[in-house]
Amino acid sequence: GNISTALGIALASKQTFAVLGDLSFLHDLTGLIHREEINCSFIVINNDGGGIFSTLPQRGVDGFESVFGTPHSLDPAAIAKAMGISATTISSVDELKKTLKAPVKGISIVVANVPSRDENADSLKAIYESMNSI
């Protein structure tokens, strides 16, 4: 999974940041069970489900939320803490910048709470459209 891959990459580095979505984090939790002396900070983008799927044409059709959105209402930081892993939650760009400037010591989880999946998808669409017009 994504967590195990990031940890493997981090073995060859002094410190690593890995970015993944909340669903990827939840699916790959077992990768955090056997920890080595690895310096890897996971930035978990938490939009309560599969945000990437909200960019697809099926967004808004009947059944979309249960099949693609898959909201979970879980707290990734609380789950990480229950596993004995350092975890914090951020909700601003300034907090993210501060996190990225700090040294990475061991394995940690930084949960970045972001706008709703729909707002996020609309923002991505606007970015893609502006890039296509260049």
Task: Please report, for each region that a protein language model flagged, where it lies by residue.
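Thiamine diphosphate
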Residues: 1-134
